[in-house]
A protein has these predicted regions:
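ATP-dependent carboxylate activation and anion-phosphoryl transfer catalytic cores
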Residues: 3-7, 25-36, 50-52, 289-353
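ATP-binding N-terminal substructure of ATP-dependent carboxylate-amine bond-forming enzymes
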Residues: 1-151, 171
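A conserved helix-loop-beta module that forms one wall/lid of the active-site cleft
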Residues: 137-197, 203
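Short catalytic-loop micro-motif centered on adjacent basic/acidic residues
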Residues: 110-113, 163, 229-231
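Internal nucleotide-binding/catalytic subdomain
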Residues: 200-311, 315-317
Length: 353
């Protein structure tokens, strides 16, 4: 079987076209009123996963329980979600031509990005053509760009963050690091999983941090130069994740999740997190504000903004709470909800979609 072969003998059928008289209806109304169908019937709800890892696998299972037809795409065959989906594909999702060909073939009603290495221009074009991107193509683009996300969170929404500067050259990085002070953290504005990040404790290490950021950024093989963010190294006591659900019913925040990391890698999480009085509510307020801002961007672009968001927060030694980043999908620390809640983050994501 080739990498592009299907893993089950399923006949592909396109979803029925939206009648012309409903074209002016909002994306949220269309999504809420979409008949779910049955996965092997004539008119299934067709869901395409872009990324087929462990988290995607759990979401795929929940969507299939609700009656959706699922195709899981990743850069290699045999990824976890591909092993449970109705069909799978292996391709370079950052390649615009390959991704467009996949959309043309599958004709998805719903697209669920589970990774960040995606040709976002093609994703946005497909959303504009009527597909529901989860939570939205606009949100996916914002959340994979630290500069856009930080500007939204701090400068537009007024959320507390570490002091930061952006730099597009080594000289700008030197100046920015001097302004925020040492020690500081340097990250590419476009990277994931800690790639390209470094802690800089003196001006002597700035050159090495710039090189590390350029080599670790997303699409480092495409040449040019990546902008970076340099931010003060906060006196961190611990980190929290607040799962936040956006759906047709509004926005709901969940009890904060505590976590432990080693060398930047997630090791364990627990819910509820152990926090002093008032900390949970402050954390949930920050998470709600962040997601409200993102959903507003999605709706302004004509999209729903529905789904689960993992809002990452820093708790400092003085008890203050800072916004860090947002994952516009179920969060790895949220896997604990499979044991701690009646509905896991994956079930919530599927229902919100």
């Amino acid at each position: 079987m080739t990498e592009n072969a299907v893993n089950t003998a399923v006949t592909s059928t396109s979803s029925p076209a939206i009648p012309a008289e409903t074209s002016a209806v909002s994306p949220a109304t269309r999504a809420a009123n979409r008949p779910l169908g049955t996965p092997l019937g004539k008119h299934p709800t067709r869901v395409l996963f872009l990324g087929a890892g462990e988290l995607g696998k759990e979401v795929a299972i929940e969507l299939m329980r609700l009656g959706a037809w699922v195709c899981a795409a990743d850069s290699y065959a045999g990824a976890p979600a591909q092993q449970v989906a109705h069909e799978y594909r292996a391709l370079d999702m950052a390649n615009a031509a390959e991704l467009q060909a996949l959309f043309d073939e599958i004709k998805p009603d719903i697209i669920v990005p589970e990774v960040e290495a995606i040709a976002t221009d093609v994703l946005a074009g497909t959303a504009a053509a009527g597909a529901q991107v989860v939570p939205s193509a606009e949100i996916a683009t914002i959340c994979m760009d630290r500069e856009r996300l930080r500007v939204l969170a701090h400068e537009e929404l007024g959320l507390p963050t570490t002091p930061y500067r952006f730099a597009g050259s080594l000289e700008e990085l030197r100046a920015g690091a001097s302004e925020v002070g040492y020690p500081c953290v340097v990250k590419p504005v476009m990277s994931s999983s800690g790639h390209g990040q470094s802690v800089v404790r003196s001006a002597d290490a700035i050159d090495a941090a710039w090189t590390e950021a350029q080599e670790g950024r997303r699409a480092a093989d495409e040449g040019d130069v990546s902008r970076v963010i340099v931010e003060a190294l906060a006196p961190l006591e611990r980190e929290l994740t607040v799962l936040t659900v956006s759906s047709s019913a509004g926005i709901v925040t969940c009890t904060p999740i505590g976590q432990r990391q080693e060398s930047g890698d997630y090791r364990e999480s627990w819910q509820p997190a152990t926090e002093p009085d008032g900390e949970a509510e402050r954390a949930r307020d920050i998470a709600r504000t962040a997601v409200e801002g993102l959903v507003a961007k999605a709706q302004a672009a004509g999209e729903t903004g529905w789904g689960v968001f993992g809002v990452e927060l820093f708790v400092l030694t003085d008890g203050s709470i800072l916004f860090n980043e947002v994952s516009p999908r179920p969060h790895d620390t949220g896997m604990v909800t499979m044991a701690s809640q009646r509905l896991s983050e994956f079930a919530l994501h599927a229902r919100a979609i």
